[in-house]
């Protein structure tokens, strides 16, 4: 099989593709102008990947609820949504936002949005959808894990399932219905996005 060809290989055996420098030369300025034109025309949408729980951070519920603002005590959600509000102020257009949650974070995310009046975002321009779940495997043995007697344990399918989940929930049509031609994707635990 194809995978067996690589058994015993080392990194030194690998072919390295040529390095491609992004944003080199005058291309960056032109790209920024095109991006600003697309924002001003309302052709940009955003997808927030927010399926993770905040347990490693000591936060109950969705990771987006974790408070990181040193002075404002703002949550990750509030900081990220603030960036979209800044785009609205600068370009005069809202950015439609799709938020991918998981079974573990969906209800908490929806409750947060409702309790905080969508942090100033237009609720009609926010789509919340869930990523799929896959059977959980033991990392060492590869065996299926059980969540209880006769019940398979599952886990979110991760970032790789984003496009399928977006298509399955009707998100691609939703974006198109709002005039979106380009989508920027960012993660909930990146407050600088």
What are these language model-derived features?
Residues 20-45, 59-193:
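Domain-scale recognition of functional cores that engage charged ligands
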Residues 51-56:
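Conserved adenylation A10 loop of the ANL superfamily
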Residues 1-28:
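Low-complexity, highly charged intrinsically disordered N-terminal segments
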């Amino acid at each position: 099989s194809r995978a067996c060809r690589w058994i015993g290989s080392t990194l030194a055996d690998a072919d390295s593709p040529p390095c491609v420098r992004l944003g080199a030369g005058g291309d960056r300025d032109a790209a920024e102008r095109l991006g600003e034109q697309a924002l001003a025309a309302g052709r940009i949408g955003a997808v927030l990947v927010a399926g993770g729980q905040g347990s490693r951070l000591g936060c109950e519920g969705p990771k987006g609820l974790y408070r990181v603002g040193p002075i404002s005590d703002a949550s990750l959600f509030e900081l990220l949504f603030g960036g979209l509000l800044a785009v609205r102020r600068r370009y005069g257009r809202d950015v439609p936002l799709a938020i991918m949650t998981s079974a573990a974070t969906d209800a908490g995310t929806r409750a947060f949005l409702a309790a905080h009046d969508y942090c100033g975002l237009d609720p009609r321009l926010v789509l919340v959808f869930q990523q799929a779940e896959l059977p959980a495997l033991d990392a060492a043995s590869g065996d299926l894990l059980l969540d209880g007697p006769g019940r398979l344990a599952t886990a979110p399918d991760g970032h790789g399932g984003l496009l399928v989940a977006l298509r399955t929930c009707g998100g691609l049509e939703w974006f198109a219905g709002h005039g979106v031609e380009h989508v920027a994707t960012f993660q909930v635990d990146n407050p600088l996005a």
